């Protein structure tokens, strides 16, 4: 690949599939810039819609142990279930209850929702949405199916893979994002569209893969597209009618980013006002500065603050994002590329940023800062502190006071050689120049890789022991070789780096950990041959559930890590397990379907001979047998002594707006 032209190289690095890579290359030859985006779709003029008390409704759903009513079950993304019918003593009798295909065969991240006796779920592209009746034992009856109309250009600019991380529910509405950029609210009973708003524009390199959240009567969502030179953006819409409440950028002026007058008042060392979102980029790089917030969002209903992280700052060849020439000069703070790589706290009513902490200033490794911000109360130095915890891709587990952004802990949870430590006074990492890529053509070995100490796969925590988090982590590093910048037309790959992924330890690509964020050490660890790219689930039955890329779904003792149960699913697991109760039984459910960045070389059929394909994922995949894992796209449910039935997804579905009859809806967008 080193002998390729820059034009071919850019496309090969970000290839989502052979055909899509060719389509991306073809765009380099187009002279015309994309048309300006159309105005967001607005509902017909009507009287102001009543605002539902969604916070109280969500709290009621979460208080019912039978439900999995939110993305992480609760506002804080704890991914903890109080159910205990399935426990250490009887989990050995856990068997398949029923399973169903989703009519999609790309990577299945995310998780279903369960409210009452209904399950809701969203597939990978084409984003089939299902409502399933759970009232019958060992059976899932499809109530309706909806497939949105989409812009197929989104597939070619979806980094990395055409995944979807789920939906949210409140006030009788189910809300999700389509890959081609629509935030869509459906009537949860019928599957009919209530409203649709355009947030992302594929012609500009933008997509939606995240799961919107519903808080304070609003829907909050963000875009993807950092590898295509986008400018990150988060917006909020009224749940009742879809009217936009606010929209804030990740880069640009203080006004663009919605920084409040008291931004970072408690921690001025983290950066305050002064248009740093412009000034810390050379040559107006902020206009393509990345910072897309494509990960997970949490919410504190008492503080009325929403929390999320922003992604990497544009192209991966870092010298273009610094106005100087040496590592020392680029690490002074002058070229931090703010506010990429930042954990933000925003007021839900206005979008005003109360505080922001940039974890990896002047990111040189693609350590996207979008991982889940988990809300817990912790005892820190003898005091009870309302905290936000983030296991960042850069390999550090951060603990901050979620009220004002004060940094309380920052400990390595995986090998991380790019930084010695985090300076707790300034909040800045103490970088190691030898492991910090900068000059074009100089290869650097860095731990962890760009895929992170862990990627977006979410951790779980039991609130009864809120310092210990259960996480699947990545056990490999990378060789990163920055390249010269080529064509930078809007909507084209914006990377310009060669990346190779290398295992830290043969035969142990994944490690599941119980990690104490206060003490900064693991309580136990489990080594897995294949990556652990699923999220984890912890239950009051004393169990932690997780899945592996080669399809093993496992339950272990949460106190010791001892394996208590396992079953093999037909494809790799990159989805997040949930627990719920229906028809008198506790169930555990999870998606299977290999994909995501880790499985993209398999899901998209990339060239086994190009180890740099999919930003280095191809070399890792084909040298470690990922190509032997079958493709898939199913939801699986388990209970004690389940009957093991297969449900036909379109057998009883009814037509839903957006794609014709349910039986053929999936075909209309391909």
Model features per residue range: what roles?
Residues 221-233, 281-282, 308-337, 474-505, ...:
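Short, conserved, GDST-rich strand-edge loop motifs in beta-rich repeat architectures
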